[in-house]
A protein has these predicted regions:
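N-terminal and secondary-structure boundary signal
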Residues: 1-424
Length: 424
């Protein structure tokens, strides 16, 4: 029977982290003598509450040091439209790593190699370092997955399994980030198995995984809980339960369970700790607040919430709420449009996604004053670039550092080989 520890954070975080490992024989037994460790955080962006808590990361690194880890590495590949070096520089994550003498591995700056996603016949790129360290059965290093406890507008929840999407190269992430997303997440879980997954539930994030800073208090709640175990699917099953969801409501977890990549039945998991205080169902959908003068036309045949629809709406929302972005344009997303409606379109238009671009561009290209395209299912960098122009928002103001420092950091990232797709 899989075991999952649920620890209330009532004392020092370092002690709470140790308490998560305790039911598995303690940190020393889980490490099994390994002196090198890689910690995969969730650091998609530098906006408030979008990343693993620096306090939790600090506690994790201190505990690993205490139990003999000598070569300590923290790794991430942030979301598109940004670059990982920026996220660590603009948040306390970078300072925590330096204080604990942990090396930061910016995965977008690493050389890549191709692997096939099992069962999908799709070849995608991962950092060669990740493939060499964790792509086989035998490993010398300890792999700790530390996601943030979040609901997610495109995947219902984002926990350990979803956190591993950050291992994939950004250029491949934007493709098939549609109805295929859940199958891709389950396939990645088959390739890369963390030795231990520890969910940071100090604060839960909901109404999507990317809350606008101006309304972040409406999108977070302090829970003061850590959840951990060796079986990532079992840990995610318990994490989903804390957020109010069953595995059946989370397609990628249901797929992983069906394919046998862990225990995904709550009744078959030995939960060490108390779940009774978690009684809410935290909404995963976005807040219903968008500029009234932006017209969104969805195709009648298909419009994937996992791709062109909710990625675009999330950017639209935070530019509107946080940066007072202007409207006065149309967004087309999905496929299966009314041809006459397309012919009647005027003014500026954003074609969001591959389907809308392929279907609508030939029809509207001679009628609309300005056309922007985001030509993959989740071409977030192009979406940000287009929407900042349409909404008259300076993209250099999207990060909490000066424009000069932003450009210096970007130059450093490019110098080190960054493949990140930046939205400027």
């Amino acid at each position: 029977m899989a075991k999952v520890a649920v620890v209330d954070v009532e004392q020092e975080l370092s002690q709470a982290v140790e308490d998560v490992f305790a039911p598995f024989g303690g940190v020393s037994q889980v490490l099994a003598g390994r002196k090198r460790a890689f910690v995969k955080v969730n650091a998609i962006d530098c906006r408030p509450e979008t990343y693993t808590s620096p306090a939790v990361l600090d506690a994790v690194l201190k505990v690993l040091r205490k139990y003999g880890v000598e070569d300590l590495n923290v790794m991430e590949n942030c979301t598109q439209g940004n670059f990982t070096r920026m996220v660590f520089a603009a948040t306390d994550l970078g300072r925590v790593c330096r204080r604990n003498k942990a090396k930061i591995i910016y995965l977008d700056e690493q050389p890549v190699a191709e692997m096939e996603l099992p069962g999908l016949g799709e070849r995608v790129r991962f950092p060669r370092l990740i493939i060499e360290e964790f792509g086989g059965q035998e490993r010398e290093a300890f792999y700790l997955n530390v996601p943030r406890l979040k609901a997610h507008s495109m995947s219902v929840v984002t926990l350990g399994t979803k956190n591993q999407l950050g291992l994939m190269d950004q250029l491949d992430r934007m493709k098939n980030h549609n109805f295929n997303l859940h199958a891709r997440l389950a396939a990645i879980a088959q390739i890369f198995r963390p030795d231990f997954t520890l969910i940071d539930g100090v604060k839960a994030v909901f109404y999507g995984h990317y809350p606008p800073a101006s309304v972040v208090d409406r999108c977070t709640e302090t829970l003061n809980v850590l959840v951990g175990g060796k079986d990532m699917l079992a840990v995610d099953t318990v994490g989903a339960r804390i957020l109010g969801y069953s595995v059946e409501e989370v397609p990628h977890l249901a797929l992983a369970r069906e394919q046998g990549w862990g225990c995904g039945r709550l009744e078959e998991i030995e939960v060490i700790g108390d779940l009774s205080r978690f009684t809410k169902k935290y909404p995963y959908h976005l807040l219903p607040e968008f500029p009234e003068d932006v017209k969104i036309i969805k195709g009648g045949e298909r419009c994937c919430p996992e791709g062109c629809e909710l990625n675009t709406k999330a950017v639209l929302q935070f530019l509107y709420l946080d940066h007072q972005g202007k409207g006065g344009f149309t967004i087309l997303m999905g496929k299966g449009f009314d041809r006459e409606q397309l012919k009647a379109l005027r003014g500026p238009v954003l074609l969001a996604g591959k389907c809308a671009t392929q279907e609508a561009l030939p029809i509207i290209q001679n009628n609309c004053s300005k056309i922007y395209t985001s030509a993959e299912c989740n071409d977030l960098a192009s979406t940000i670039k287009a929407l900042t122009k349409l909404m008259k928002v300076n993209p250099l103001k999207l990060v909490p550092v000066s424009p000069i420092r932003s450009l210096v950091l970007l130059a450093l990232a490019k110098l080190h080989g960054s493949r990140a797709r930046v939205g400027i």
